[in-house]
């Protein structure tokens, strides 16, 4: 995590030498942000000798935000996996074959820091705190339908790029990294997400 934060700060520092001209959305703008992409979770399956795993899944995001000025905004956002993570293997406890599935989602609130690069582009850093939700299931011969839901409070850090398409529409590309989801007895792991999306201004008229 420290390496990720250092990388974010380094990129923002390097970009600070570029002449600032404008920004993708004006000050005092309320907007919606819709995006989708691919998420990858660390498996964290210490209770099972893993034979195979599917750790990639599509994920959808929806948020609403407000831009205070050229450099600062705030965003509340939620995301969910569209398919489940899956793993197959042998349980350490009783040597039974088992299948594990998990699906993660989150609800976050995040300050957002902008660095305009030109008249249509900018970098942004989003650092948030909220709920990391997980639904896991373990199927084995002795326990065919074990389910567990978890809700953790954790952080999410996002680094992204935005490009203005029109006066009201902005294209975004970002990478998100979060605290671990789940718990040690089911599926636990950090989550990384690369996604592309659109921001749409709700109150900017021009």
Language model: regions and residue ranges:
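Cleavable N-terminal export/targeting peptides
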Residues: 1-28, 203-206
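Start-of-domain marker
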Residues: 33-35, 43-57
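Extracellular loop and loop/strand-boundary signature of outer-membrane beta-barrel proteins
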Residues: 46-51, 93-100, 141-147, 181-186
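Predominantly the C-terminal beta-signal and adjacent terminal strand-loop region
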Residues: 77, 81-88, 104, 155-206
């Amino acid at each position: 995590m420290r390496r990720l934060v250092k990388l974010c700060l380094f990129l923002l520092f390097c970009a600070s030498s570029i002449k600032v001209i404008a920004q993708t959305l004006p000050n005092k703008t309320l907007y919606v942000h819709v995006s989708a992409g691919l998420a990858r979770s660390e498996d964290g399956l210490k209770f099972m000798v893993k034979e195979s795993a599917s750790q990639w899944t599509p994920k959808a995001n929806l948020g609403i935000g407000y831009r205070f000025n050229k450099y600062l905004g705030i965003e509340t956002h939620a995301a969910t996996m569209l398919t489940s993570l899956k793993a197959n293997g042998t349980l350490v406890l009783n040597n039974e074959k088992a299948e594990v599935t998990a699906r993660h989602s989150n609800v976050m609130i995040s300050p957002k820091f902008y660095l305009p690069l030109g008249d249509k582009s900018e970098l942004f850093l989003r650092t948030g705190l909220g709920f990391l939700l997980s639904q896991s299931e373990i199927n084995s011969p002795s326990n065919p339908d074990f389910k567990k839901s978890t809700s953790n409070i954790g952080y999410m850090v996002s680094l992204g790029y935005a490009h203005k398409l029109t006066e009201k529409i902005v294209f975004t590309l970002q990478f998100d990294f979060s605290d671990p989801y789940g718990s040690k007895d089911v599926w636990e792991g950090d989550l990384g997400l690369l996604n592309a999306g659109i921001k749409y201004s709700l109150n900017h008229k021009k």
